[in-house]
Amino acid sequence: VKELGARRWWAVAALVLASMAVGFDVTILSLALPAMAEDLGANNAELQWFVTSYTLVFAAGMIPAGMLGDRFGRKKVLLVALVIFGISSLACAYATSSGVFIGARAVLGLGGALIMPTILALLPVMFDDEERPKAIGAVAGAAMLAYPLGPILGGYLLNHFWWGSVFLINVPVVIVAYLAVSAWLPESKAKEAKPFDLGGLLLSSLGLTALTYGVIRGGDAGWTDATTLASMVAGLVALVAFVMWEKRTLDPLVDLSLFKSARFNSGTMLGTVINFTMFGVLFTMPQYYQAILGTDAMGSGFRLLPMVGGLLVGVTVANKVAKALGPKTSVGIGFALLGAALFYGGTTDVGSGTGLAAAWTAAYGLGLGLVLPTVMDAALGALSDDSAGVGAAVNQSIRTVGGSFGAAILGSILNSNYRGDLDLGGVPAAAQEAAKDSVFGGLAVARSISSSSFADSVRNSFVSALDIVLVVSGFLGLLGVLIAVVWLPREVGQSTAKAPESEHDAADAA
């Protein structure tokens, strides 16, 4: 597969389109929720399931998706996944009830679960050590580009059409991606099909689903909530049982020796840290732009473009920097830069305006771009061609659950500090819960009681909470520096068959 010449880069273009389709869907739903609540008559619980149904199926489906790609062919699985994603997007767009929409979103999550691990599995199979970081940078950069483009395109569509149009945007992207994958992507799969590990499939899916649900619920209902604790404990028990099963079964779904790889472990952990810090930016900053600066959703998307600009610059030079300085140093510098940017963002006040936000988000994007290709290459480069699907799915699963933890924990920090600083004096008791619910709820209450002083309290409380979230995210960036320096091997661009796993192994090999 690696001997395809220029055709491989056309294949990367196909993978870029597929990853952008999933990326659009991540950011675009939140824009449509108010209109959907009114049109479908959805209550708050149903609105939460609009989001949760996708996330749970996505978490449960990734490892089975990796196995299917390894067994039946990654190109075949990706084509089927694109069809599922396109049809379920149509079903979402034309849903006539909350139940229908939740079901369609669950199927959409299945499509996403099939797409992402398959894309990641194809990169180490298609590219050698020299070119793989460039391909990873292209796919990762495109996926990140979808985050600001989602609100921009979604905001435009909602201003001119009905809410279903934000899901129809997936359809042409999927069609073009399908044609491109069909034309340019080579087929690849394991040389020998392993027997189905049904026990491993069931335990991994159950564990990831229960743990993810517990984390999501914990962010809303609290970490001492009985259902939260029960879900998280059940998930952890299932995952421990999964590991024990994999150790004893003759044909395990996941080769646990993968976790002896310093490259895979460090790359996966650093990817999880990245997902944590991204929440600090991508969840909080659109709220800041809309609630504090008064932009609409489309305007908040435009204000994320400095971050994307920095990201694209970082991705472009990341491979050269890693070659010149070594991956330990280049990744350490990238995490130090994004951490410093987050600390700078933590100095924001109500009167800061767009200039400060543009400066620190651009610096954050640059740091992110410097680390993403090398970190992903560390994990994906440790995979053999035969097990690339399952290995990529394990990497994606850990990063997804880690990102969910980041969203829940940082979201809890944001909410608790916002509520703790809010001055509710003079606010009617009946309106206090709505004011504490979110910055948007607080501003709505301030308008309803015609209180400019309470509006000021809402804004100040939110910005103070935002600063704390960004500072915590900054410390996570410093954690990334520590992991890179201590754990990341000096060389990550060598295949597992050719390179020792770590400095300790290198000494032994000598």
Outline where the language-model segments fall:
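C-terminal membrane-cytosol helix-exit motif in multi-pass small-molecule transporters
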Residues: 172-189, 207-216, 235-248, 480-488
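Residue-level signature of the transmembrane alpha-helical cores
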Residues: 18, 80-84, 88, 104, ...
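Transmembrane core module of solute transporters
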Residues: 9-58, 62, 142, 162, ...
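Flexible interhelical linker loops that connect adjacent transmembrane helices
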Residues: 2, 176-205, 247-262, 323, ...
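Hydrophobic transmembrane architecture of multi-pass small-molecule transporters
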Residues: 176, 376-378, 382, 394, ...
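Interfacial helix-cap and linker-helix signal at transmembrane-aqueous boundaries
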Residues: 36-37, 68-69, 153-161, 215, ...
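Structural signature of transmembrane alpha-helices in multi-pass secondary transporters
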Residues: 22, 51-54, 58, 85, ...
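Helix-loop-helix hairpins in multi-pass membrane proteins, especially solute transporters
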Residues: 62-200, 226, 309, 351, ...
